[in-house]
Amino acid sequence: MNGGPAGQDAHRPVLLDEALDALAIRPHGVYVDGTFGRGGHAAGILARLGPEGRLWLVDRDPEAIAVARARHGDDPRCTIAHGRFDELPGRLEAAGLLHRVDGLLLDLGVSSPQLDSAERGFSFMREGPLDMRMDTSRGVTAREWLEQVDEKTLSRALRDYGEERHSRRIARALIRAREDGALPETTGALARLIAENVPGRPEPGKHPATRSFQALRIAINGELEALDALLERICDLLAPGGRLVVISFHSLEDRRVKRYIRKQSTVGDLPPSVPVAPEALQPRLRSVGRALRPGEAEQAANPRARSAVMRVAERLP
């Protein structure tokens, strides 16, 4: 999640200095910013790279890619690519960069510019159309998805992607509204309908629609599937000593990253009868330090930083 509130350095990423340090940037290295956003991390990486260094700037948001091209299109060190980060392995392989990436950074979730743009439809704090696509050049909008999804799938998405306890009740209300020709068309209308179907007192400091909006966004963008697909190829991309740095903003993402690093950091335990090459049993990553969260000062300056957690792993030889 790139950026902070207006009035400060509007697009300063959360844990910026910590992420740059964790990458252990070498002047001649090859690095990948898998979530360019508005370029805060990229600028920091480029400042530490020498003329022979290389940086891939990747984002699925056309607006972010436009910013990348405007700022770094003339920099010979930069390769700019529009697409999901799970498409990265194929692109890097085509460029001959398997096992040659010295650092890969992922700043997951929705960016502050996306949240702050009413037209994008990510936030109920600003009245706008129900879009929610991270890539506005393809895919269905949230409104289109709600027009065709069945109640069971919708309920499961709200439960699994939003950890919403009242997923069935909310799903039933949305399907009923659709059948009555009253399916919400704006973020505000959707938030109100959801709030009406969340019983009890709301959680302190959290709108009743927060979990559902997260779930819908994750579902229509395939965020967790993209993350899982990329993680499975990380060890094919990183050079020995290369770093993986991931900043997550909710437990669904962080659990996946934590589980992946743990799995790749342990020795395989298979029966002697299973014919596996010895190197296949060896750990491929080592966890670097503990999970890191923003300090009190950063959280006070940027409330969106409160849920952030950064994990780092290093590719073993």
UniProtKB/Swiss-Prot annotation:
- Coiled coil start-end: none
Recorded hits in InterPro entries, A to Z, give: RsmH, SAM-dep_MeTrfase_MraW_recog, SAM-dependent_MTases_sf
Functional summary from the UniProt entry? Specifically methylates the N4 position of cytidine in position 1402 (C1402) of 16S rRNA.
| One Pfam family hit | Methyltransf_5
Per its record, how is this protein called by name?
Ribosomal RNA small subunit methyltransferase H
MF terms from GO for this chain are: rRNA (cytosine-N4-)-methyltransferase activity
What Gene3D superfamilies does the database record attribute to this sequence? Answer: Putative methyltransferase TM0872, insert domain, Vaccinia Virus protein VP39
Class of the enzyme per the UniProt entry, highest EC level: transferase
Identify the GO cellular component terms for this protein: cytoplasm
Q: Which domain of life is it from?
A: Bacteria
Supply the PANTHER family for this chain. Answer: 12S RRNA N4-METHYLCYTIDINE METHYLTRANSFERASE, S-ADENOSYL-METHYLTRANSFERASE MRAW
Q: What family is this?
A: Belongs to the methyltransferase superfamily. RsmH family.
Establish whether keyword S-adenosyl-L-methionine is in the entry.
yes
- In which compartments does the protein localize? Cytoplasm
Q: Does the keyword Nucleotide-binding apply?
A: no
